[in-house]
A protein has these predicted regions:
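Active-site "cap" helix and flanking loop/linker of ATP-utilizing ligase/carboxylase catalytic domains
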Residues: 235-256, 261, 271-327
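Internal nucleotide-binding/catalytic subdomain
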Residues: 155-265
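A conserved helix-loop-beta module that forms one wall/lid of the active-site cleft
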Residues: 86-154
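Short beta-strand-to-loop capping motifs
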Residues: 158-160, 195, 322-326, 367-373
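Conserved short beta-strand edge segments in small beta-sheet-based binding/regulatory domains
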Residues: 182, 343-348, 389-393
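ATP-binding N-terminal substructure of ATP-dependent carboxylate-amine bond-forming enzymes
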Residues: 1-97, 129, 302, 324, ...
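Short, well-ordered beta-strand elements within core beta-sheets of diverse protein domains
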Residues: 184, 228, 364-372
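Glycine-rich active-site loop/lid that clamps phosphate-bearing ligands
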Residues: 322-352
Length: 393
């Protein structure tokens, strides 16, 4: 009989993990409170539950003879997987305290400040009045963030006190824990540096440029590898390996989002999980490392150090989320032939006929593309929103 594993969520982001786990011989159960997500159709079984609720998932695991918990492309999934695994003595995850330190923005910024890691200096607030008093003397622009959300939720930039008041109210309203951080707004090029840890050492890495032309707090497109990757790889690897040693991190993905100014950088977020938008598939195509298999091995508590390297498929690749210009019903979208010829995969999330209720966050489709050079790709991607037409009813 196959061992049961639980993957926390079943969006299209989790499909590669679901398929790889099945290939490895596991019976895959997915969960989450959105039963219509496409990933659930790929699983062997779907059991509804709120994957951000640690106690609910703990009960689900106990009641269904599940042997391992796999985190999803969301920070709440990382926290729940760590919590449940710690309670049941399951391998493959950081301790719950470490997971909170790394994935809650206020705790992570305290950690970076304590250890001299280059990051914006953050001030943490647990009530609105203190935050609103602070902004009276703040140096603008600032950025206000809920500490426990992802995907650009609960984040706003403020140029003045009036905007800051609105940003504070927005962040507190969005945050589950009612914790927010306020920090200086750092300008520069946004990039992601993604690495894989085995025995607390980085064994593979790459990076990407990140583009957010529609919603400045939501990445819409990414191109791999990052421009100037070699200039920042060594210091970032040193930071990651130092954190891994000090916090005794489990094997698996470790990534930073950062703002670059030449060789200087500020770390703004970190993640120990697969990203949304099937980003790990791009990373796998752009390197010679089997990221999905290795991530599953890590969270199953298996030794992945002997996993064979794979051919590097796509030296210059990326993805872009097609977004609607306004809310409404998607009638039609069209990708020009000049872009189409570079696309090797397209995934429709909200096809024609679908209703868009939040055009600043929802995607109509994801396109995955490759080019002959990094320069050509980066220039092309900047024009995608102008050239890809979307008709709404």
């Amino acid at each position: 009989m196959k061992e049961k594993i639980l993957i926390l969520n079943g969006s299209f982001c989790e499909i590669p993990l679901i398929e790889e786990a099945q290939r490895l011989g596991y019976y895959v159960v997915t969960t989450g409170n959105a039963p219509d997500l496409i990933g659930h159709k790929y699983a062997d079984e779907y059991i509804p539950a709120d994957y951000s609720n640690g106690e609910a998932i703990l009960s689900l695991v106990k009641e269904n003879d599940i042997r391992h918990v796999i985190s999803c492309a969301n920070d709440f999934g990382v926290l729940t997987a760590a919590y449940v695994s710690e309670k049941l003595g399951l391998p493959g995850h950081d301790s719950f305290e470490v997971a909170k330190t790394l994935h809650l923005k206020d705790l992570f910024k305290e950690y970076t400040a304590k250890h001299g890691i280059p990051a914006p200096i953050s001030t943490v607030f647990v009530n609105e009045e203190d935050a609103k008093e602070y902004i009276k003397t703040a140096k603008y622009p600032i950025i206000v963030k809920a500490t426990d959300l992802t995907g650009g939720k609960g984040i706003l930039k403020a140029e003045n006190e009036k905007e800051a008041i609105y940003a504070i109210e927005n962040a507190f309203s969005a945050s589950r824990s009612k914790h927010i951080v306020i920090e200086p707004f750092i300008t520069g090029v946004q990039q992601t540096f993604v690495s894989f840890l085995q025995n607390k050492k980085v064994v593979s890495y790459t990076g990407c440029n990140s583009y957010s032309p529609i919603n400045p707090y939501l990445i819409q497109a990414e191109t791999l590898p990052a421009e100037g990757l070699d200039e920042i790889a060594r210091p970032l690897i040193a930071i990651i390996e130092n954190i891994a040693e000090e916090l005794s991190l489990a094997d698996g993905v470790f990534a930073f989002q950062l703002i670059r100014n030449g060789k200087d950088f500020h770390i703004i977020e970190m993640m120990r999980r697969p990203f949304g938008n099937q980003f790990l598939q791009l990373v796998e195509d752009n390197t010679d490392f089997p990221w999905h298999t290795a991530q599953l091995y890590a969270q199953l508590g298996l030794d992945g150090s002997a996993l064979p390297r794979i051919p590097k498929k796509r030296p210059f690749c990326g993805h872009h989320g097609i977004m609607a210009p306004r809310n409404g019903t998607v009638k039609h979208y069209e990708i020009p032939k000049e872009i189409e010829k570079h696309i090797y995969e397209k995934v429709e999330i909200n096809p024609p006929g679908s209703e868009i209720t939040n055009c600043m966050n929802e995607r109509i489709a994801y396109i995955f593309y490759e080019y002959e050079s990094l320069e050509e790709m980066n220039e092309a991607v900047k024009t995608f929103n102008e050239r890809i037409t979307v008709e709404m009813a």
